[in-house]
Amino acid sequence: MAANVGSMSQYWKRFDLQQLQRELDAAATVLANRQDESEQSRKRLIEQSREFKKNTPEDLRKQVAPLLKSFQGEIDALSKRSKEAEAAFLTVYKRLIDVPDPVPALDVGQQLEIKVQRLHDIETENQKLRETLEEYNKEFAEVKNQEVTIKALKEKIREYEQTLKSQAETIALEKEQKLQNDFAEKERKLQETQMSTTSKLEEAEHKLQTLQTALEKTRTELFDLKTKYDEETTAKADEIEMIMTDLERANQRAEVAQREAETLREQLSSANHSLQLASQIQKAPDVEQAIEVLTRSSLEVELAAKEREIAQLVEDVQRLQASLTKLRENSASQISQLEQQLNAKNSTLKQLEEKLKGQADYEEVKKELNTLKSMEFAPSEGAGTQDSTKPLEVLLLEKNRSLQSENATLRISNSDLSGRCAELQIHLTEATAKAVEQKELIARLEQDLSTIQSIQRPDAEGASEQGLEKIPEPIKEATALFYGPSMSSSGTLPEGQVDSLLSIISSQRERFRTRNQELEAESRMAQHTIQALQSELDSLRADNIKLFEKIKFLQSYPGRGIGSDDTELRYSSQYEERLDPFSSFSKRERQRKYLGLSPWDKATLGMGRLILSNKTARTIGFFYTLFLHCLVFLVLYKLAWSESVERDCAATCAKKFADHLHKFHESDNGAAAGDLWQ
């Protein structure tokens, strides 16, 4: 059976009912959207068909009418089939959406199966103990000294009482100390984790601020260097352009001067040639010779001036070339320095960007911290979460889920602690009750022994009946049986083992009874826990639907987007179901049937609804019924136990007295003793 329950639990875990419900929610939402779209498309098709009938001639309409009717019939059949499929899907969806997950119940059932298996093991162990008890009884049968056995048993009972008390006290103290230590350790760990997270977050914020400041500083420096570099490069380029223009002008002037010098040289050569011709012609007049001399001297002066100007221009060109090379070298060195600085800044910027990427989750951590602060501390501190990317509705849903999980864990821990405390209390009450019962049993045995010992021994031939009136009735019956006509022995147990067997059997019976009560209490507690969780789940579902209604109201304002979360879709479908006219019609029908009931039926139904709807009323009714049953069982058990104890005590006293008579009056006459008792 445990294997079947375990396999069923594994099957339901693999089945994942919650995931199926979410998928059904999404499918229901898509189905509703498709219904709206199909309605709109159908309306458009009807309008288009009407326009077609209006705009087309009658002959064409008659020809197309059968085709349109066949199309319309097919469309109606398809729509009918889709509606039937959607109705079937919605019925399946309505039945499956509120089905609770049976995995926790199966787990509880599996645990109960394990406990039942343990109970069977305990029963087998009990059988073994009974066998050992029988062996002990056989061994105890060899003991004949009754007084020594009684004293030893009394000493053992006292030792057992002391050990039980000490064990119960030590177990209770150990459990209490262990629970306190566990709570203290958990609280300390929680505080340490909170402090460590806050310190790490502060360090991360500080590092991020320093990195941001360093990044901004490097960016400003890099921007300044780029601007300076651009300005210097533009200035150098302008200066180089000016020098180049000056150099070009100087080159042009040098070329012009060279051309003029060449022309002058040509003129000079022509003048020399003319002088040579003039020297050959000696017959020329003196005026012409003077003119030629003057012309020659003026040309020589102009040639010298041009040569000086050419030399000066060449010097200017050389000086400009030297300054240009020097300027190029300076600009190249400055450009290399600026490039080195730019590379250094770029490397620093890359390092800072890598550090920033390494701490890229700062915003997420900060957002989570603000969300936790807004949910954990005062409402005024949660104003920072309004700037986060998540909307308020998602935060509320997440908070609701976290509170549900925390409530479940606290409830489980509370149930565990209460169960442990109840077990310890039960152990303590069992120990005290067992000690009291053993004391009462010892007192009864001592009283019976004193009663038996106080009886005077009758004479062999006869005695008065005054002392015999004090003998209990069970002893008389045992003696009558002992001295009856059959003369058979009525004692089946040894002499000194009756009280020990009685105490052992009674203690064993009490142990079984308490174990059975513990198992019944655990079963009832598990059922009560399941019912409480189911009711709490229903209340949480109703609260979530109300919360979704508020979210829907908030989303109705302009500028608010509608989320597409699975949880919102599921609660949206439940909210739409609440607005369903069929459900309202069914509610009205139920109200009409309720009004048609008799007053007695109304009172009974109202009382049942009141008890089932209110948690306090359910608890009171449950405990009241449990108290009545326990009271009846306790009274019946007390009556049965008292009768059993009386019978056992009477039988014990009778057997002891019969053994005593059999031992000490064996030589007496049986007939005389029979007459005496008569």
UniProtKB/Swiss-Prot annotation:
Tissue: Ubiquitously expressed.
Cytoplasmic-facing ranges: 1-619
Coiled-coil ranges from the UniProt annotation: 16-40, 67-374, 427-454, 502-556
Record-listed Phosphoserine modification sites: 586
Family from the record: Belongs to the CASP family.
Subunit structure: Homodimer; disulfide-linked. Interacts with GOLGA5.
Name of the molecule in the record: Protein CASP
Protein species of origin: Mus musculus
